[in-house]
Amino acid sequence: MSLYTTQSTQVSFEMHSALEKFNEHRNTLKMTTGSADLDSLIDGIQEGIFYLFYGNHYTILEAIMYRFLINCVLPAKQKHGFESMGVCFNNVDYYYHDAAKKSSAISPEKIGVAAKCAGIDPKIVFKNLYIHPACNEQHQLLVAEQVADLITSNKDIKLLVVNRITKFFKESKNKMETANILKQVIGIISKACAKNKVALVCTGDANTTARGIIPRPIGGIYLKHAANVIVHIREFSKTSAIPSFKATLIKHQYTKTPKSTILYVRKTGGMVLLD
């Protein structure tokens, strides 16, 4: 449905038949998450849709990030990928000398390991990925504008992964100012992705101080309303050497929520991958 407003403030609506919407959905490109259970929960990753995966266990969110970046490049028919280019918008403290904080930078070694596990030459993946780091909230806003321009100018891009989108909001002492910047960032990238049919995947933090069985995502109401699909992920079992995680679908366009599944990971080449 398109909305147009004339100078006389009259509003007209362009109506679409159910068949048109069905054909549009049927022809929509869809990428696997790399997990049959997660695919079943959210119906894969579709172009033009905004996904938010959030929680406080960074291991699983990082595993999702690397898996999605690789899957974007995979062939569409044989491997259920987008067979296209992807962008990683990484929010990280690059100017710290703390090794633990440096480890949150995107690792070429981990991309290589994940690519080999997916059965694709790492060189092909490297050629089809853009990585844009942001080191503070002001830089985050600048990078958002650059990424939006890149998506608009390069029609081969079908996936944007924003790693730790709420990082600077979580760590900020001036929540009001940072919340406003975060809102601008979300608005810029979500509009660019929707307009150009690019899948938008964000990872974020959970608000552990909030009441309720399932914590809300950090970032305010705007983030919650902007995302089309929202999944909360928490550690489920510590009984084995490799933990499992519970993914709970909080919001979806056409699936009843809440709905949950268990995700498994595997350790390989010094990293954890979604299984």
What are these regions (language model features)?
Residues 56, 90-93, 165, 205-206, ...:
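Short, ordered loop/turn segments at secondary-structure junctions
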